[in-house]
């Protein structure tokens, strides 16, 4: 039986109505830096990038070194690179993993993160044969939770003292967990 990574190799690109999910390249660095250097965007995701070189290094480290299950989000209408979505932490035995995403704030509140998330969820359950997907967000970032809910994921629980905040020294993060099983997905389809 093929493992998830072999199956993922066949899905380097995914199309939705408005989006083209595709591999991230070094040429995407300026567009990624546009949002990766914005503290409003990175507040609940990753350390803010301080130079284009840092963004290029991150692309090489995270997207070029391990490209499977990682997509750049590009607008079909104009080819603009606006964010990323990842299928991470794959458990090959249990066939489960997690979804993470980040979007340039100029494209927030347009349903684009939800559209990309729904596409990755469909791929995970319909093509890859996964059993369960998990997504988490900082309690102080409810907009991310709305993306998860609109994508069909179900609230699971809150995890107090989950980690230290990357941006606010001393603040302990409560993470909110959302889950979707294959059975739940198929029942709602």
Model-found features: residue ranges?
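Acyl-donor (CoA/ACP) binding surface of acyl/acetyltransferases
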Residues: 1-39, 43, 70, 74-189
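Conserved GNAT-fold acetyl-CoA-binding loop/helix
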Residues: 40-61
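Juxtamembrane/interface motifs at transmembrane-helix termini
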Residues: 51-54, 63-65, 76, 102-104
């Amino acid at each position: 039986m093929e493992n998830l990574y072999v199956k993922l190799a066949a899905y380097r690109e995914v199309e939705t109505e408005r989006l083209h999910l595709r591999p991230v390249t070094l040429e995407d660095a300026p567009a990624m830096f546009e949002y990766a250097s914005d503290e409003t965007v990175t507040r609940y995701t990753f350390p803010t990038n301080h130079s284009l070189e840092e963004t290029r290094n991150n692309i090489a480290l995270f997207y070029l070194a391990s490209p499977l299950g990682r997509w750049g989000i590009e607008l079909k209408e104009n080819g603009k690179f606006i964010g990323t979505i990842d299928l991470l932490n794959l458990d090959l035995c249990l066939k489960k993993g997690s979804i993470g995403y980040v979007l340039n704030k100029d494209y927030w509140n347009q349903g684009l993160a939800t559209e990309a998330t729904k596409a990755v969820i469909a791929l995970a359950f319909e093509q890859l044969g996964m059993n369960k997907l998990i997504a988490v967000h900082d309690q102080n970032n409810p907009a991310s939770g709305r993306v998860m809910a609109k994508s069909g994921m179900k609230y699971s629980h809150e995890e107090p003292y989950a980690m230290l905040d990357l941006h606010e020294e001393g603040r302990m993060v409560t993470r909110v967990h959302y889950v979707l099983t294959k059975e739940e997905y198929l029942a709602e389809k």
